[in-house]
Amino acid sequence: MVNELLVKQAIEDRRYLHQHPELSGEEYETCKFIRSRLEALNIEILDFQPPSLVGFVKGTKGDKTIALRADIDALPIMEEGDKPFSSKNPGVAHMCGHDGHTAILLAVSEWIAKNTKDIEPNIVLIFQSAEEISPSGADKLVQQGVLKNVDAIFGIHLWQGMDKGKIGLKPGPMMASVDDFEITIQGYGGHGSMPHETVDPIYVATHVIQSLQSIISRKVNPMDPSVISVGKIESGTTYNIIPDSAKIIGTIRTLSPDAVRTIQSQMVQLTEGICKAFGATAKVDFIIGTPPLVNDPKESEFVESIIRRTFGNDVFELVEPVMGSEDFSYYLKEKPGAFIYVGMNGKKSMYPHHHPKFEIDEEVFPDAIQLFIEIIKNYR
């Protein structure tokens, strides 16, 4: 299995990265760190726009090319806890495991550099900026042509929602799309004592908010899991003034592109209809985000066979889809591939992703590294 020195280096790298987190789109020092490591391994650096970084290793056959990806950005969260390698950047922390993903792919890069004579396919190593925001780093890299000559792409996520010792994925839709919305309701304000002389946008907004859920229950195919959530309402300035306008801000999650289209069209129709009934007007804006993550069936089967053969049948887990999103989906829209969860839920990883006390379990690093190595060794 994986060399202990390789794992030790991965842990050291992860802890260094954890101490020096950078926000999405600002990972320039992280990029410099990765570049220095790859250059020390004599791995070619391809010409892609920083702060993402892409390495390339030519295989002995070179008739196939696979890409491996790690995201490198941190979150705007104040870390809680007293570990000796806590974030040194106040208000910024690796609370999703991207420090681990980066360290794991660096370890795999080192293995590749030391075993080039035994590696048949070409390898593209993607260290990707800005997974946590939109427009995302994956979308930008795809537009820049990072997958131009790639046959398949693979990525992992250290996953707190899966038990430690399990590794798994799901063929087909595995993670949801995310599209945000802003609904602006224009009414007619006035004094709070005379509501009959106004068109109260707050009152109208309450009807819109409650009615949005009817789209999920009555307009979307029940076989297409979907969510509409309102996260913010903005309106008014004080207690005795009915305002002119109200804004409703929220998010749409679904595993189906068809459901996205249905939800958006129905939101516009429903909102405009309700507003018209009350004498108000509405403007509905959508902020298009990450598409659903859909694993390729063939590559999923390939990964499942590797997990079962390498780690044992009891390690593989066929996962349930989740309504969280992941911009790895942009790669999978372009090329076949698979996104894989490496479970780590347990005593060392009890808090969920994006929690101020989130922690990854470094004991799962050997399996994650080995998984990538086996994908490289067995891809044909």
Label the predicted regions.
Residues M1-H94, D99, A103-I119:
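Acidic/His- and Gly-rich active-site-bordering loop/insert found
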Residues V2, L6-D13, E26-R37, K64, ...:
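General structural feature for long, well-ordered alpha-helical segments within catalytic domains
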Residues L17, G55, L68, H98, ...:
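Divalent metal-coordination and catalytic microenvironments
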Residues E22, D71-D73, A130-E132, W159, ...:
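Active-site beta-loop-alpha junctions enriched in small/polar residues
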Residues V54-F56, E182, F339:
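Conserved hydrophobic/aromatic beta-strand scaffold that supports enzyme active sites
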Residues L75-I77, K83-A93, G100, K117-P243, ...:
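Histidine/acidic-residue-rich, glycine-tolerant segments that coordinate divalent metal ions
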